[in-house]
């Protein structure tokens, strides 16, 4: 059974930082590109970031709205993917999901950016 479990969300002030984690099980994690996607009432579902495989030198790609502020990383030995978020803005508020190429999704973790 494939499982993805996100954690690390919560309330943070504008300009603050937060790190999200996602632990995977039930598949060979190192063989899959991983993504972070977020959902908000205002913007709907929005792709945030992608990290590829060791064979791709762990190449990363980002949505323009988060470029320079967010960093995606992975640890294949821990079957985990991370999202470091800096200089957070109100518009970053939403439920953040990790996905395996959009085939499998976690339950999400809520990030609220508010003073």
UniProtKB/Swiss-Prot annotation:
InterPro entries with a match to the protein in the record: Ig-like_dom, Ig-like_dom_sf, Ig-like_fold, Ig_sub, Ig_V-set, IgHV
Domain Ig-like: 1-114
Cysteine pairings via disulfide bonds: 22-98
GO annotation (BP), single: immunoglobulin mediated immune response
Signal peptide: none
Alphabetic keyword roster: Adaptive immunity, Disulfide bond, Immunity, Immunoglobulin
Organism, scientific name: Mus musculus (Mouse)
One GO MF term: antigen binding
Gene3D superfamilies, sorted: Immunoglobulins
Entry-linked Pfam families: V-set
GO terms for cellular component: extracellular region; immunoglobulin complex
Further information: This chain was isolated from a myeloma protein that binds inulin.
SMART domains: IG, IGv
Name this protein carries in UniProt: Ig heavy chain V-III region J606
SUPFAM superfamilies associated with the record: Immunoglobulin
Keyword Disulfide bond assigned: yes
